[in-house]
């Protein structure tokens, strides 16, 4: 060990004057490991830090960062400096061991950062070492704000995979101005909630020669099995969304004091169970992405003068009967989540109360390999643009277009691709991201970037299934 330590000191002396790296020693048992860290003395930061790396989703995100870093190297790009962060050094080392096994890549250069969501000082230190924090610690309603605060106060960008409306809109209300001033992008909903919805619409706009009025979206998964259980972290986040639903209104009224203009050709809200005759799909109303899309459309109307697109979201079902059964299941989950005592029981016995749909251990890896998702969006609009976004058309929409977004298992594989792609887009295309900073949605932040192409390189697809045509 003395020989190793002496060698390490010599290496540190050699590279400590570098503007890029310093070195530190991390001891694991009797083995002293030389681990590359971002230089605190020289003020350098890691490009990416995965916070919550020891969690179920965090493990998948670490593996996706490793593959992305390898891809960047193979393309001759600037090497990625990155680290993983959590409370336990041993567990962080275990994460790297698993990631090395799953990816077949050497991860000796990945840094370790100790940080605890209950210790603001440690979060500040982590953020000060980061260019972009990839925050995997949820539920965000419980644990998200201290991380956002640390990033804003210490000049780090931030991405998360929150689908929790109260958290996202509260963060925009509290930290948007400070984030703008600090020049950092705080981007929520960078996973299955809500990148396919928000950026699917963006892809549709790029390919629609005219102006869109409305979009309907149907989500579908396939290839699952009884072993494809959902991790309880997702369940807890969903339950907290339901529990806190009454608080959203007050936040939104303060955040958006004036309503959007009423559309001349308003699309009627569909019922819980609805069939789209054009697509031939049955759908169950499931508006999880609607608040995110609303914020994007509001921004584009207020800041860019665009016409807000009306948006409705559904889970695609194979039949009317399947749809009715899903509605019953959703009503059951809604009731369990609405009261504190039933919610506590749900959190304590998720496997029993959800018939194995949610498990604390999450899904078995093998069961995720055949799992895929498809998002189908059908847009309706006008074939010609008016001079101003505030002008009104004399006749109803006359054209339609269909876009599909596809990817691997939505909960972990695709979510990791989307989250890491969002972080890499901020890292590599910061100047193309919206504004100089702020708390925003993916559809705002990444509208003018190459994030869609980046995600397609990593295994997803955004395609125009049906070119624009007259109704």
Predicted regions: what they are:
Residues 40, 206-471:
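C-terminal catalytic/substrate-binding lobe primarily of soluble NAD(P)-dependent oxidoreductases
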Residues 78-105:
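Glycine-rich phosphate-binding loop and adjoining beta1-alpha1-beta2 segment
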Residues 127-136, 158-159:
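N-terminal Rossmann-like NAD(P) cofactor-binding module of classical short-chain dehydrogenase/reductase
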Residues 113-129, 139:
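Conserved Rossmann-fold cofactor-binding substructure of NAD(P)-dependent oxidoreductases
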Residues 138-256, 288, 292-295:
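Glycine-/Pro-rich loop/turn segments that contact NAD(P) or position catalytic residues
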Residues 46-69:
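N-terminal Rossmann NAD(P)H-binding glycine-rich loop of SDR-like oxidoreductase domains
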């Amino acid at each position: 060990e003395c020989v190793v330590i002496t060698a390490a000191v010599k290496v540190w002396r050699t590279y400590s004057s570098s503007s890029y790296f310093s070195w530190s020693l991390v001891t694991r048992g009797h083995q002293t490991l030389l681990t590359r860290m971002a230089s605190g003395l020289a003020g350098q930061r890691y490009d990416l830090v995965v916070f919550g790396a020891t969690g179920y989703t965090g493990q998948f995100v670490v593996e996706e960062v490793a593959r992305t870093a390898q891809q960047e190297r193979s393309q001759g790009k600037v090497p990625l400096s990155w680290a993983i962060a959590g409370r336990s050094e041993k567990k962080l080392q275990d994460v790297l061991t698993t990631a090395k096994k799953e990816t077949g890549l050497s991860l000796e250069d990945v840094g370790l950062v100790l940080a605890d969501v209950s210790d603001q000082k440690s979060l500040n230190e982590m953020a000060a070492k980061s260019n972009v924090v990839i925050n995997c610690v949820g539920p965000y309603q419980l644990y998200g704000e201290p991380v956002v605060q640390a990033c804003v106060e210490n000049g780090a960008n931030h991405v998360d995979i929150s689908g929790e409306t109260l958290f996202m809109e509260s963060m925009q209300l509290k930290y948007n101005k400070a984030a703008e001033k600090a020049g950092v992008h705080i981007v929520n909903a960078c996973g299955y909630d809500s990148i396919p919805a928000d950026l699917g619409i963006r892809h549709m706009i790029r390919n629609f020669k005219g102006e869109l009025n409305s979009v309907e979206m149907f989500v579908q998964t396939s290839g699952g099995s009884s072993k494809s259980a959902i991790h309880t972290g997702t369940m807890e986040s969903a339950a907290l969304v339901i529990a806190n639903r009454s608080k959203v209104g007050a936040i939104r009224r303060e955040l958006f004091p004036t309503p959007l203009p009423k559309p001349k050709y308003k699309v009627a809200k569909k019922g819980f169970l609805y069939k789209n005759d054009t697509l031939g799909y049955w759908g169950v109303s499931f508006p999880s992405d609607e608040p995110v899309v609303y914020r994007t459309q509001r921004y584009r109307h207020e800041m860019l003068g665009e016409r807000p697109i009306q948006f409705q979201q559904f889970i695609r079902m194979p039949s009317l009967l399947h749809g009715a059964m899903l509605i019953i299941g959703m009503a059951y989950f809604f009731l369990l989540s609405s009261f504190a005592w039933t919610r506590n029981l749900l959190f304590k016995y998720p496997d029993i109360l959800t018939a194995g749909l949610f498990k604390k251990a999450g899904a078995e890896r093998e069961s995720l390999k055949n799992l895929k998702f498809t998002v189908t969006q059908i847009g309706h609009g006008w074939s010609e643009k008016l001079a101003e976004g505030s002008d009104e058309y004399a006749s109803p929409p006359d054209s339609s277009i269909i876009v599909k977004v596809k990817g691997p298992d939505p909960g972990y594989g695709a979510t990791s691709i989307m989250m890491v792609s969002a972080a890499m887009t901020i890292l590599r295309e910061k100047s193309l991201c919206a504004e100089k900073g702020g708390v925003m949605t993916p559809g705002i932040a990444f509208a003018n970037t190459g994030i869609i192409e980046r995600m397609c390189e990593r295994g997803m697809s955004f395609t125009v299934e049906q070119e624009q045509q007259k109704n």
